[in-house]
Amino acid sequence: NNVKLFKAMAKNLKCEIVESSENGNEATVKAHITTLDFAKIMSNISSRLMVEYMTPGNSGKDMDKVFSGIIDDEIKHADKKESDTVFNFVKDKKGNWTLDSNVAIYDDICGGYLQYYFQQNTLGKYANEIKEKQQSETTTQN
């Protein structure tokens, strides 16, 4: 199912160079990126899967097929996401242009997928910290 998501990401990615400049060993490219809003897609998938898993009687369902169908539906009805991104390049020791990368560039290319992923992992981390603190307080009180 992840392959399906990343294929849709690649298929729907459009990058239009708006402006570029070169100054010695540095270059800047301003681009307009259009892709699907993967942060929204992932949020919708998570919400819909939670409902499916929590619905009584769904335990016998082939959840992989349900998951795949939800992904197809979300991709089919996804909103576009547009962003203006600046790519900075520098020449390496061999004279080849290399991307001076940062996470924001990758997130723009991925339609917000990385930001969604990081937020979910951060929330999970805080949820675990809260749970551990509550367990510690309960143990201390007993």
Q: How should each PLM-predicted stretch be described?
A:
Residues N2-I75, G124-N142:
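Surface-exposed, charged secondary-structure patches
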